[in-house]
Amino acid sequence: MKNVAVIGAGSWGTALSLVLADNGHHVTLVARREEIAREINERHTNETYLPSIEIPSSIVATCSMEEIIDVEIIVLVVPTKAIRQAVRSLNDVLKWPVTIVHASKGIEPGSHLRISEMIEEELEPTLLKEVVVLSGPSHAEEVSLRQPTTVTVSSKSLSTTKQIQDLFMNQQFRVYTNEDLIGVEIGGALKNIIALACGLTNGLGYGDNTKAAIMTRGLAEIGRLGVKLGASPLTFAGLSGLGDLIVTCTSIHSRNWRAGQMLGKGKSPAEVEESMGMVVEGIRTTQAAHELAQKLQIEMPITSALYSVLFEGKKPEHAADELMGRVKKHEMENLHDVVSDQKND
């Protein structure tokens, strides 16, 4: 049994806490809101984020970082914009080096850093053993019901990756290892952009043909940028690429899909986030990916079209028309060029 802290008591943080508790680990779940922590400890529920799910007594909630000083592993499950502050706060409380597993999906606008890079920047080197990413098609609602789910873990250290695989894996939660840290993080982050686009086209009244086109061409965009950043193209055919893309673009559980649908129906980005009452990672990631694409001179037309809707005020139907009216191309044109560049490197 290990002492594990999970920072973030939303739906995904709570669901991962359940997996760890099922595996016999003692879990300290750090919540931002006092009422959430109290409910978990007293009523053993988290109705705000995971309605009707019983939380075992082996999960103890707190709002104080001071209560995680004795942990061996920290699972970080907070929005990308909160990563730096959350990690920075650990510098004053940790007593020894820890492994940080992050289950967040995003890229930081401006710096264009992946989450593992942000963690490495903020945590004192003497307090960090390794950063591991956990990603894949894994809706919290289904994980909490113990429905069969598969995910991928990756880090710079294969031995550490295997340790985290053992930490989480059970009969309902199957964990694969992957040595492509960049690819796993990029796939998990960028699929939120494509989910927004799929939801947007649904809001416009378009059907399955459009959704299939967005998903397929969206995966090509993810691959182009990912490979340029050093990822393996094979990773995007796996759980953290295609797998996560499918589940996020087709499920009612997907907040990015639902946000996109609202955009397609005419709501502004601000109205969407206010209506949902939670962070929509795909909005910030669209900004970061658009900036990266321009910097690296990579064509990402779906991302660019979505950026024009989110940040330039373009009407969704006009963005869709422009996307369809682009100059004709070979299906594998840009992806082939990027893969060739990687081989030459």
UniProtKB/Swiss-Prot annotation:
Broadest EC class assigned to this enzyme: oxidoreductase
What GO annotations for molecular function exist for this entry?
Answer: glycerol-3-phosphate dehydrogenase [NAD(P)+] activity; NAD binding
Q: Which organism is it from?
A: Halalkalibacterium halodurans (strain ATCC BAA-125 / DSM 18197 / FERM 7344 / JCM 9153 / C-125)
InterPro entries per UniProt: 6-PGluconate_DH-like_C_sf, 6PGD_dom2, G3P_DH_NAD-dep, G3P_DH_NAD-dep_C, G3P_DH_NAD-dep_N, NAD(P)-bd_dom_sf
Q: Where in the cell is it found?
A: Cytoplasm
- Gene3D superfamilies in the record: N-(1-d-carboxylethyl)-l-norvaline Dehydrogenase, domain 2, NAD(P)-binding Rossmann-like Domain
Could you tell me which pathway this protein works in?
Answer: Membrane lipid metabolism; glycerophospholipid metabolism
Q: Which residues cross the membrane?
A: none
Q: What is this protein called?
A: Glycerol-3-phosphate dehydrogenase [NAD(P)+]
Its function, per the record, reads: Catalyzes the reduction of the glycolytic intermediate dihydroxyacetone phosphate (DHAP) to sn-glycerol 3-phosphate (G3P), the key precursor for phospholipid synthesis.
